[in-house]
Amino acid sequence: MLDSSARQYIVRPNMYRTLLRDLCFLSLLSMVCLVPACKKPQRSGIVIGSKFFTEQVILAELLAQRIEARTGIPVERKTNLGGTLLVHKALLAGQIDLYVEYTGTALTAVLNEPPDRSSSAAGKGVADPVYQRVKQLYAQRFNLEVTEPLGFENTFAMVIRGEDANNFHVRTISDIVRYAPRWRVGVGYEFLERPDGFHGWTDFYHLQFAETPRVMDLGLIYRVLVDRQVDLVAGNSTDGLIDALNLVALEDDRHYFPRYDAVPIIRKSTLDRFPQLGAVLSELGGKISESDIRKMNYAVDVTHRDAAVVVREFRATKGW
């Protein structure tokens, strides 16, 4: 069981409330798209959005502060909007101008392209074939600009308890094949349904678990793992809670997952209105390391610090 201090920094949203909120927001977006006569006046500034987890809120705040400092353009924050497809639809509908996506997610969940596992052995950043494919297709299909990667990858992490990693001497996903029939799994609802998610992963590694995966909000997965309600969860590699709770992320030794480089995506119409944004976003290319984002995630998730304050302090250390 988690002690009282650990419980304080585990988020406990209800998954079904999250799904209901997403559906309601999608309905509102649909009404906006179906009523062209109700044309909105052009904004004097921009709106930056985010998905519904800590890292996304941090990245939205980082972009907002950087843009405000460098250009003086007013920035509205619309964070915690929901999952991948909902935020993508908000971008297409003009409800937001900009958000940070992950290249592997864009390829599989948005573009419905098969995972490109060659990227694991190829170059990273702009040299990555997944990045190049996503950049090309987002421009062609959506009239969106995929800017330079920020410098870190946030891939799916198959996470187990540290004591189990030591007791069973496992460090890679292939190592757990023999134990999987006795193990229970917890996943987020998006990972369960994605083409690069649970079913493809288990087939690729020939994994069979004790029961159907338990689907839950991402804010709950580490709690149920530490509480021994499950034995493995699908988390994110940059989560600060992995180290905080003495958990171990297994190595994807057969390179199932493509690269998931963090990239800002912006409407080209927004770039037309504010061409200076292109230079500001390019300046951030390659400037945020995996260690940087993990420390910021830890500060917000574990020590309960405000994301805006954490970002300001990070920018100060970088001289931004």
Residue spans of the language-model regions?
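Short, well-ordered beta-strand elements
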Residues: Q42-E55, I73-T79, P181-V187
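Acidic helix-start/capping segments at beta-turn-to-alpha-helix junctions
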Residues: K78-I96, T103-T108, P115
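Short helix-initiation/N-cap motifs at beta->coil->alpha
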Residues: E76-K89, E211-R223
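Contiguous mixed-secondary-structure segments that line small-molecule binding/active-site clefts
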Residues: T103-D203, L207-T212, D231, N236-R294, ...
